[in-house]
Regions:
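Active-site beta->alpha loop and helix N-cap motifs at the rims of alpha/beta catalytic domains
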Residues: 1-139, 144, 152
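Catalytic alpha/beta core domains of metabolic enzymes, predominantly
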Residues: 119-128, 134-215
Length: 215
């Protein structure tokens, strides 16, 4: 079953002037974007600066966002980490906080993608897991040919590589979501499942139109 179809937002984590997380403002942002047509909310993805948050703050952000948006809109939690053990712990925390799905990026240079994603999937307790291909933060990323061998339902691709995106859409049987706003007009018409975008924090309607081929 498809996690969602269309455009989702890679949510910003809003802060108070002293640097503490502003849970209320972050939740309000999520609720407002859900009301403007977002089909999924990604909390604590790379746009949400998870490396700056404590484990408790990450859990609190997920819980606040889940409580702020309608139940039919999936809340996806970012749980990528340098080791499988840490990623599994973050995943378990996110599920406990109410996450409906998980987005995990592998460690840089990871030679054991299968073991890493198996640990994340086990901690997700049956919730869907998306692999995150973003070689700028975690090189070399997830090879297209590896995707079908992993316990994931889809991939978010933020590489910005149009050829790779088309290869994922045509060769990989799971769902392909682009993380690149520049590829929105390609992803939708080519048959991609959707997008998870930072740009949707400020221009959700334009992102929706672009994915639909109207941008």
């Amino acid at each position: 079953m498809q996690l969602y179809n269309g455009v989702g937002v890679a949510l910003l984590t809003l802060l108070h002037s002293d640097g503490d997380v502003d849970l209320g403002a972050t939740a309000d942002l999520a609720a407002g974007l859900a009301g403007r047509g977002m089909q999924a909310i990604l909390a604590c993805g790379t746009t949400g600066e998870p490396a700056m948050l404590t484990v408790d703050e990450r859990r609190d952000v997920v819980a606040a966002v889940r409580g702020a948006v309608p139940a039919h809109i999936p809340v996806i939690a970012g749980t990528g980490a340098p080791t499988a053990e840490v990623a599994a712990g973050l995943t378990a925390d996110a599920i406990e906080a109410g996450a409906d799905a998980i987005l995990a990026w592998p460690p840089a240079g990871s030679a054991d993608l299968a073991g890493y994603f198996a640990a994340v999937a086990a901690a997700a307790q049956g919730r869907p897991v998306l692999a995150y291909h973003f070689p700028k933060i975690s090189a070399p990323g997830v090879p297209v040919e590896a995707l079908a061998t992993l316990p994931v339902v889809g991939v978010k691709d933020s590489s910005g590589d149009p050829n790779r995106l088309l290869e994922e859409i045509t060769r990989y049987p799971g769902d392909t979501y682009t993380g690149s706003s520049a590829l929105l007009t390609l992803c939708g018409p080519a048959g991609g499942a959707g997008a998870l975008l930072a740009a949707a924090n400020v221009e959700p309607e334009l992102c929706i139109a672009a994915f639909a081929g109207d941008g």
